[in-house]
A protein has these predicted regions:
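Bacterial N-terminal signal peptides that target proteins for export
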Residues: 2-15
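Predominantly soluble domains enriched in secretory-pathway, periplasmic, or organellar proteins
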Residues: 20-347
Length: 347
């Protein structure tokens, strides 16, 4: 009897151990929540980073020439623009399953080429197509592009969409403009057809990185060639101020979530010229950072406590503490980190 019980206990113990090990392996394979997503451009890979440890927990193929990345609202999917520029003019958007941590079949955009800027809003994916001078919208539910609108501008590069979905903003690099695209009011009895009006505002040579203030009142746009920031009043659609900044080759510009500060990265390199922080109200420089090399993508955590900045020239992502205004850590990445995204999975 004792021998049978011992055998039974040994078998049960082995089963329990197996279940525990399986659970441990399953937990280890989970994408952390929250997670930092980093595009390693030259490696054509997506790195998934655990912000708690600053370690890469997985890498997933990101398709050819990945530039920008955005996550779906539920944090389950990531979309990556495969750019190609003027030479190869690619026409795909890579899709990554962040739960399974694997690449899904890419979105084929057909004649729409050189996709770059991305925004996910209202359950749909907005994108720019530079070759065609347009913005488009992809519906994941129908797996089709359901809307396209021309900007008439050269190198329509980055895109942002208002929460109300009735206002869209783009930066147009070679035209040196910001486009404000607004939905026209539909007259009663005119049917379901919607029309849009486009206003283009001069914003400096090589306008690329831009952001809309959290209150929706201003657009701040950085000029890569002029080393300036143009401030645009959204209501009047006019540039109200141009600020000189101490960053060369400006690449990205982001407001903090509370709208009090603005971070601007630069690819120009040089000591003290990789990242600058401005006070939004006073328009004054608060701090300059020397990150060791040209800086690109910027993403901030929702509570505004820290920012992550891709230091493309040094194959790392810097962590900037926005309370102490100091660099508090870094993530070692693959070659040429660029686009960044923050994922907070819904429970």
């Amino acid at each position: 009897m004792t021998s049978k019980n011992s055998r039974r206990n040994l078998i049960w113990g082995a089963v329990v151990l197996g279940v525990l090990l399986l659970g441990a392996n399953f937990a280890a394979a989970q994408t952390p929540s929250p997670a930092l997503l980093v595009l390693e451009k030259s490696d054509s890979m997506l790195a998934i980073v655990d912000p708690a440890t600053l370690q890469i927990v997985a890498r997933v193929p990101a398709g050819p020439d990945p530039h920008e990345i955005v996550a779906s609202s539920d944090g389950k999917l990531a979309y990556i623009s495969n750019y190609g520029g003027a030479d190869s003019a690619l026409n795909t958007i890579a899709v990554i399953d962040l739960v399974a941590r694997k690449a899904l079949p890419p979105i084929n955009l057909g004649a729409l080429r050189s996709t770059h800027g991305l925004a996910f809003a209202g359950g749909k994916l907005y994108f720019t197509a530079e070759t065609n001078k347009v913005i488009g919208r992809y519906d994941p539910a129908t797996q089709s592009v359901d809307w396209v609108l021309g900007t008439g501008q050269d190198r329509t590069h980055m895109v942002a969409v208002s929460e109300s979905l009735d206002r869209i903003f783009t930066s147009n690099v070679s035209s040196g403009t910001i486009s404000i695209i607004e939905e026209n009011a539909v007259a009663a009895g005119s049917g379901p057809r919607k029309t849009w009006r486009v206003t283009n505002i001069a914003a400096g040579h090589g306008t690329e990185g831009f952001d809309v203030s959290p209150d929706g009142k201003e657009i701040w746009a950085a000029s890569a060639q002029d080393a300036t920031v143009t401030i645009i009043d959204v209501t009047s659609k006019r540039a109200t101020q141009t600020l000189p900044i101490s960053v060369r080759g400006t690449n990205r510009l982001k407001f903090t979530p509370d709208g009090t500060r603005v971070l601007i990265s630069g690819l120009g390199g040089g000591a003290g010229s990789n990242l600058v922080v401005l006070e939004a109200a006073t328009r004054k420089e608060v701090k300059k950072f020397d990150l060791g090399g040209g800086a690109a993508g910027i993403v901030m955590v929702p509570d505004g406590s820290r920012a992550y900045v891709a230091v493309s020239g040094k194959d790392k992502v810097a962590v900037v503490d926005l309370k102490s205004m100091e660099v508090s850590g870094s993530v070692s990445t693959g070659k040429q980190p660029d686009g960044l995204a923050w994922v907070q999975g819904k429970k």
